[in-house]
C-alpha cells in the first residue's frame, strides 16, 4: 500500500497562553500544500515494525513518528502481524512543515485499512493526539482551524488554490526552545484569525496574504536573522505575503503567479538548498493500493 503524506503550512499562528503542563494553548489556521512524502506499507509475518527511509537524517526506531504510530496501532488493537514501512522523504526535515506528523497520520490511515480495523476519522484523530499535536490536522487536511495545543481541528472552507514558495534555511530550530523563549507579554503583533477565516471563505488571495502572521516568528528570527532575509527577497520579487511556518525555520510566500515565484527561487538558491514551489491543496491520501 502506497500513501501520500502531505506537508502543512500555518497561515496564522497565535499563542494564547501557557498551560500548567508546560504546553501552550494556540489558535492556528493550517493548510495542506502539494508537497508530500511517499509512504509504502506492507504486512510481514514476524511480529515486528521495520522502518526504512530515503533520508539518513531521520531515525528509524521508536523516535520516528511513523514507528510510534505503527506501535500504537499494534498495541491498542492486538495486531499480531508485523509491518514494514518505507518513507520516501520529500518534505524538508525539522522545518515547521509537519514532516514527522504527516508520516504518522499516513501510517494510522494505512494500517486502519491494511488490518481492517474500520476506525472512523474521529477515532483515528484520537489516536493521532497521542502521537503529536499536528497529527490530527494531518489526518483531516485541507484548510482547518486548530486549537488547544493544535489537536482540536475544525474543518474550514477550502482556501483558493495559491502559488506557494517554500524556502528552508539550513539551521536547526527546536520547537520546545522557541515556545520556551516566547514572552507573551512582549508580543506586539498577533494574527487576526477571524479576518483570515473571512478571507478564506471569500476566496480572497490578497486578503489571505495580507493576514499572514505567526507570533513565533520574532523568537526564531532573533536567533536566525536569515529568516528575515528570505522574507525580504520574497517580498522584493512580488510576494503578496510571506511568513515563517510553525516554529520554523521554513518560510513561505504567496505569489500571484509562478513567474515571480521562480524569480524569487532563483535569487534564494544562492544561499538556500531546500526550495520548493508548490500550491495549496486538499489531502488525497491513497495514491495506490495493493
From Swiss-Prot:
Catalytic activity: 4-CDP-2-C-methyl-D-erythritol + ATP = 4-CDP-2-C-methyl-D-erythritol 2-phosphate + ADP + H(+)
EC number per UniProt: 2.7.1.148
Residues bound to ATP: 92-102
Molecular function GO labels: 4-(cytidine 5'-diphospho)-2-C-methyl-D-erythritol kinase activity; ATP binding
Residues at the catalytic site: 8, 134
Keyword list, A-Z: ATP-binding, Isoprene biosynthesis, Kinase, Nucleotide-binding, Transferase
Pathway(s) this gene product operates in, as recorded in its UniProt entry: Isoprenoid biosynthesis; isopentenyl diphosphate biosynthesis via DXP pathway; isopentenyl diphosphate from 1-deoxy-D-xylulose 5-phosphate: step 3/6
GO biological process, one term: isopentenyl diphosphate biosynthetic process, methylerythritol 4-phosphate pathway
Gene3D superfamilies: 3.30.230.10, GHMP kinase, C-terminal domain (3.30.70.890)
Pfam families linked: GHMP_kinases_C, GHMP_kinases_N
Keyword Transcription: no
Keyword Transferase: yes
Family: Belongs to the GHMP kinase family. IspE subfamily.
Functional summary from the UniProt entry: Catalyzes the phosphorylation of the position 2 hydroxy group of 4-diphosphocytidyl-2C-methyl-D-erythritol.
HAMAP family linked to this entry: IspE
Protein name according to UniProt: 4-diphosphocytidyl-2-C-methyl-D-erythritol kinase
Organism expressing this protein natively: Caldicellulosiruptor saccharolyticus (strain ATCC 43494 / DSM 8903 / Tp8T 6331)
Lineage: Bacteria, Bacillati, Bacillota, Bacillota incertae sedis, Caldicellulosiruptorales
Amino acid at each position: 500500500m502506497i500513501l501520500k503524506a502531505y506537508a502543512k503550512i500555518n497561515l496564522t499562528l497565535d499563542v494564547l497562553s501557557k498551560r500548567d503542563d508546560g504546553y501552550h494553548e494556540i489558535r492556528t489556521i493550517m493548510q495542506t500544500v502539494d508537497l508530500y512524502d511517499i509512504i509504502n506499507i506492507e504486512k510481514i509475518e514476524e511480529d515486528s515494525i521495520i522502518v526504512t527511509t530515503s533520508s539518513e537524517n531521520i531515525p528509524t526506531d521508536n523516535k520516528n513518528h511513523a514507528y510510534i504510530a505503527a506501535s500504537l496501532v499494534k498495541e491498542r488493537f492486538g495486531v499480531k502481524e508485523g509491518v514494514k514501512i518505507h518513507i520516501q522523504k520529500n518534505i524538508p526535515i525539522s522545518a515547521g512543515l509537519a514532516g514527522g506528523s504527516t508520516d504518522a497520520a499516513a501510517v494510522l490511515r494505512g494500517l486502519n485499512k491494511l488490518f481492517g480495523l474500520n476506525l472512523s476519522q474521529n477515532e483515528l484523530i484520537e489516536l493521532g493526539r497521542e502521537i503529536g499535536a499536528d497529527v490530527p490536522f494531518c489526518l483531516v487536511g485541507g484548510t482547518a482551524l486548530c486549537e488547544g495545543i493544535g489537536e482540536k481541528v475544525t474543518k474550514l472552507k477550502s482556501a483558493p488554490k495559491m502559488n506557494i514558495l517554500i524556502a528552508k534555511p539550513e539551521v536547526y530550530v527546536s520547537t520546545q526552545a522557541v515556545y520556551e523563549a516566547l514572552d507573551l507579554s512582549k508580543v506586539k503583533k498577533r494574527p487576526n484569525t477571524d479576518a483570515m477565516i473571512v478571507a478564506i471563505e471569500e476566496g480572497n488571495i490578497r486578503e489571505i496574504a495580507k493576514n499572514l502572521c505567526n507570533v513565533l516568528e520574532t523568537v526564531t528570527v532573533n536567533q536566525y536573522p536569515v529568516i528575515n532575509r528570505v522574507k525580504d527577497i520574497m517580498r522584493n520579487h512580488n510576494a503578496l505575503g510571506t511568513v515563517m511556518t510553525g516554529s520554523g525555520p521554513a518560510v513561505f510566500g504567496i505569489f500571484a503567479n509562478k513567474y515571480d515565484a521562480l524569480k524569487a527561487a532563483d535569487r534564494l538558491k544562492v544561499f538556500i538548498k531546500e526550495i520548493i514551489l508548490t500550491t495549496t491543496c486538499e489531502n488525497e491520501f491513497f495514491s495506490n493500493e495493493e
